[in-house]
């Protein structure tokens, strides 16, 4: 019995890791069809990013690894912090406030259910 896995990664997406993790927690460990259903009915920016990434991981599993798409489930969802864009907002009396535009690195790993 071999535990083959398929992976898809997207880096430097303009969404904060904290907001992306809210969506990632919704479908971790679920079957692929259930996960897509959850993401399609979630009204968050991160859900659209995860839909693209999940479809890419499914394509990798079926085309590159010869896995059965109906048996796939989401084994691992990682949301790591990417590089931060630092900007400044001018304020009164010569001050400036820092603005951090955070980015995320997203990763999904799929496996077949036995």
UniProtKB/Swiss-Prot annotation:
Any GO BP annotation: translation
Keyword Ribosomal protein belongs to the record: yes
UniProt superkingdom: Bacteria
InterPro entries: Ribosomal_uL22, Ribosomal_uL22_bac/chlpt-type, Ribosomal_uL22_bac/org-type, Ribosomal_uL22_CS, Ribosomal_uL22_sf
Alphabetical list of SUPFAM superfamilies matching this protein: Ribosomal protein L22
Pfam families assigned to the protein according to its UniProt record, in alphabetical order: Ribosomal_L22 (PF00237)
PROSITE patterns in alphabetical order: RIBOSOMAL_L22
One cellular component term from this protein's GO annotations in UniProt: cytosolic large ribosomal subunit
GO molecular function: rRNA binding; structural constituent of ribosome
UniProt keywords, alphabetically: Ribonucleoprotein, Ribosomal protein, RNA-binding, rRNA-binding
Gene3D superfamilies, alphabetized: Ribosomal protein L22/L17
UniProt record similarity statement: Belongs to the universal ribosomal protein uL22 family.
Binding partners and assembly: Part of the 50S ribosomal subunit.
Function: This protein binds specifically to 23S rRNA; its binding is stimulated by other ribosomal proteins, e.g. L4, L17, and L20. It is important during the early stages of 50S assembly. It makes multiple contacts with different domains of the 23S rRNA in the assembled 50S subunit and ribosome. The globular domain of the protein is located near the polypeptide exit tunnel on the outside of the subunit, while an extended beta-hairpin is found that lines the wall of the exit tunnel in the center of the 70S ribosome.
Protein name: Large ribosomal subunit protein uL22
Organism: Mycoplasmopsis agalactiae (strain NCTC 10123 / CIP 59.7 / PG2) (Mycoplasma agalactiae)
């Amino acid at each position: 019995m071999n535990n083959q896995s398929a992976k898809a990664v997207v880096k430097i997406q303009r969404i904060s890791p904290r907001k992306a993790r809210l969506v990632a927690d919704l479908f971790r460990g679920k079957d692929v069809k259930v996960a897509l259903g959850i993401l399609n009915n979630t009204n968050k920016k991160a859900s659209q990013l995860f839909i693209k990434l999940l479809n890419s991981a499914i394509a990798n599993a079926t085309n590159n690894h010869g896995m059965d798409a109906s048996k796939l489930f989401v084994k691992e969802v990682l949301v790591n912090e990417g590089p931060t864009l630092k900007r400044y907002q001018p304020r009164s009396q010569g001050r400036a406030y820092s603005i951090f535009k955070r980015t995320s690195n997203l990763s999904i790993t799929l496996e077949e259910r036995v």
